[in-house]
Amino acid sequence: MNKEEQRKNSAAQSIRWHFPSIHPEGRKFFVIAVIISAIITYFSWLWMAWPLGVLCFCVAAFFRDPIRTVPEGDGLIVSPADGMVCLIADVPPPPELAGADGLGDAPLTRVSIFMSVFDVHINRAPVPGRIARIAYIPGAFVNADLDKASEKNERQHFMIETKEGINVGLTQIAGLIARRIVPLTKVEDYVERGERIGLIRFGSRLDVYLPAGVTPQVALGQRCLAGETILGQIGSQAKPLTGMRL
């Protein structure tokens, strides 16, 4: 690669860092909004064009797909979602992920991350490995911030098996506004840590089931970035974190 190509690549990367691309799942919504805005503007209905212009911006912002710097290290478990840690509790794994060949039946630490409509809604793999299970469960649409959302709402379970044979579970949960869970992977796919695996449209929550013995390295109320924030480390003897909102 010559210097001119390097310069162009560097400029393109800089633009992507400052102006994230729109995920393919959101491009059709963006195009529809732009076309409607253009038609209304053409017919001089300017009083409607402004709100639709704002709508175009909101659609682009919601489906933004920023680049993330994924940390490297043995056993690291990263956040699969942008948002705020709303719950940390020891609970039995869901039936769809339980069993001897799954997450087992004993309680595991579940870290729940609430995604508002302002957060990036691309979900990423917390660990590298094989997608061993995917299970979609239709359900209700109660507030995703509530504990019962894990059992009542529309949801999709994933189980990723690492090369060491350790299983990590995660669940996409639809919220009050979100009515569409979109998978980007399938069973038997191999994913890297931080790789895009799905998205939920318009506000939702994501639960991560940490393997036995893994201590969460986030605190209630902490903000997380998908693919970057470390939730825990397999094999680590770290102490639980506590935090204070100031």
Curated annotation (Swiss-Prot):
Cofactor(s), by name: pyruvate
Co-factor: note: Binds 1 pyruvoyl group covalently per subunit.
Molecular function terms from GO: phosphatidylserine decarboxylase activity
Keyword match Lipid metabolism: yes
UniProt KW keywords: Cell membrane, Decarboxylase, Lipid biosynthesis, Lipid metabolism, Lyase, Membrane, Phospholipid biosynthesis, Phospholipid metabolism, Pyruvate, Zymogen
Gene Ontology BP term (one): phosphatidylethanolamine biosynthetic process
Post-translational modification: Is synthesized initially as an inactive proenzyme. Formation of the active enzyme involves a self-maturation process in which the active site pyruvoyl group is generated from an internal serine residue via an autocatalytic post-translational modification. Two non-identical subunits are generated from the proenzyme in this reaction, and the pyruvate is formed at the N-terminus of the alpha chain, which is derived from the carboxyl end of the proenzyme.
Protein EC: 4.1.1.65
A single GO cellular-component term on record: plasma membrane
Protein's cellular compartments: Cell membrane
Pathway annotation from the record: Phospholipid metabolism; phosphatidylethanolamine biosynthesis; phosphatidylethanolamine from CDP-diacylglycerol: step 2/2
Membrane topology of this protein: Peripheral membrane protein
Pyruvic acid (Ser): residues carrying this PTM: S204
Principal location class: membrane
Catalytic site: S204 (schiff-base intermediate with substrate)
Catalysed reaction equations from the record: a 1,2-diacyl-sn-glycero-3-phospho-L-serine + H(+) = a 1,2-diacyl-sn-glycero-3-phosphoethanolamine + CO2
Site (Cleavage (non-hydrolytic)): G203, S204
NCBIfam families xrefs: PRK05305.1-2 (NF003678), PRK05305.1-3 (NF003679), PRK05305.2-5 (NF003685)
Subunit structure: Heterodimer of a large membrane-associated beta subunit and a small pyruvoyl-containing alpha subunit.
The family this protein is said to belong to: Belongs to the phosphatidylserine decarboxylase family. PSD-A subfamily.
Function text: Catalyzes the formation of phosphatidylethanolamine (PtdEtn) from phosphatidylserine (PtdSer).
Protein name: Phosphatidylserine decarboxylase proenzyme
Species assigned in the record: Zymomonas mobilis subsp. mobilis (strain ATCC 31821 / ZM4 / CP4)
Lineage: Bacteria, Pseudomonadati, Pseudomonadota, Alphaproteobacteria, Sphingomonadales
Gene name in the database record: psd
